[in-house]
Amino acid sequence: MNVDLAGQLIGGNVLGVTGEASVCDKLLEIADGAGIGASVKNQIWGSDSNSFAWKGIPAMTLNRDGFGMHTRYDTIDLLSAWSLERSAILLGCIADELGNAEVFPFERKMPEKFIGELDEYMCR
């Protein structure tokens, strides 16, 4: 689990998943159960989580898809306690559900379609 761009008031929660589609389904199920809206993008995600995905471990980044972050206008004024709290709740629910699962809900494998893309992304 990786977090990037958390705390923006404007925008929506996006779970960037580099892994099997079943990972996306499970994360959406957890988000729904937490009452926190999120969308999922099943793709190579430009984040620190790629180092895990590259080694075959399904990876996820929680991203707040909004405006102004990672730009010259990026200031603390763009952060929202409400948004940060919701991100923390969602991450906590995901960690709790997956960490306490009697049987882990998906395999530790990477879809073939991502393996070549990850090699290229990591300049291998």
Task: Indicate residue ranges for each PLM-predicted region.
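Metal-dependent peptidase/peptidase-like ectodomains
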Residues: 1-66, 72, 82
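His/Asp/Glu-rich mid-to-C-terminal helical/loop segments that flank catalytic regions of hydrolases
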Residues: 67-124
